[in-house]
């Protein structure tokens, strides 16, 4: 069974969070029934005390390497079973809308992997927001996860808000259907990150709002408004 084969891959990588969701909400629903979404933890789970941009970027690259390995394994299974699939690109389409073709974050929330935090990043109970997401659209039906429909960040937690260097975050709790512009000024964030292209040869990774999040910190019990 296809689903069992896919789950077997993740059983060999127990630190990776994964789930399935239907994509009836997506314009790609005419071509694919489902999305497999998974979250690979960064190489280091940095806090503000040990954060540097270089270490954060290295953590992203470490997670990206593992992610690519998993994707290749899943691709082999799908090809063997002659199942139609598509791997959406990570990158945004352009510098105007700053949106990807398929939102990994939306799919992750609907698959039950995590919720949108006040920093507009997916927050997982296990690692907080310090994960790299990927998704594969698959033309099959699976056992779907329980979706998140609202944020679980404590109302009085503002750590990501306060640490943001360009003050792009608006201290708003997420609910399903809320536009991201109500949570974050993405253009302001993007302008700040883009200012480093000449110096670094790329946008700065800037993960301060991820490092500040108390969810998933080693030795710290997560607290939510739902506890």
Task: Label every model-predicted segment.
Residues 1-72:
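Non-catalytic, usually N-terminal nucleic-acid engagement modules in DNA/RNA processing proteins
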Residues 63-227:
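Catalytic cores of enzyme domains
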């Amino acid at each position: 069974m296809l689903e069992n084969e896919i789950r077997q891959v993740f059983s060999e990588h127990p630190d990776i969070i994964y789930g399935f969701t239907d994509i009836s909400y997506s314009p790609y629903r005419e071509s694919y029934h489902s999305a497999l979404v998974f979250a690979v933890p960064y190489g280091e789970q940095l806090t503000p005390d040990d954060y540097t941009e270089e270490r954060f970027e290295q953590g992203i690259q470490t997670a990206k390497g593992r992610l690519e390995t998993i994707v290749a394994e899943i691709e082999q299974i799908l090809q063997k079973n002659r199942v139609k699939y598509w791997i959406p690109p990570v990158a945004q389409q352009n510098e105007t809308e700053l949106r990807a073709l398929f939102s990994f974050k939306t799919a992750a929330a609907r698959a039950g992997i995590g919720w949108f935090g006040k920093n507009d990043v997916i927050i997982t109970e296990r690692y907080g927001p310090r994960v790299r997401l990927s998704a594969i659209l698959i033309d099959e039906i699976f056992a779907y996860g329980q979706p998140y429909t609202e944020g679980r960040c404590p109302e009085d937690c503002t750590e990501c808000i306060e640490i943001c260097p360009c003050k792009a975050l608006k201290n708003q709790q997420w609910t399903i259907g809320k536009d991201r512009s109500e949570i974050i000024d993405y253009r302001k964030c993007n302008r700040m990150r883009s200012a480093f292209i000449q110096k670094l040869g790329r946008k700065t990774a800037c993960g301060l709002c991820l490092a500040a999040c108390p969810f998933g910190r080693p030795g710290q019990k997560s607290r939510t408004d739902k506890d």
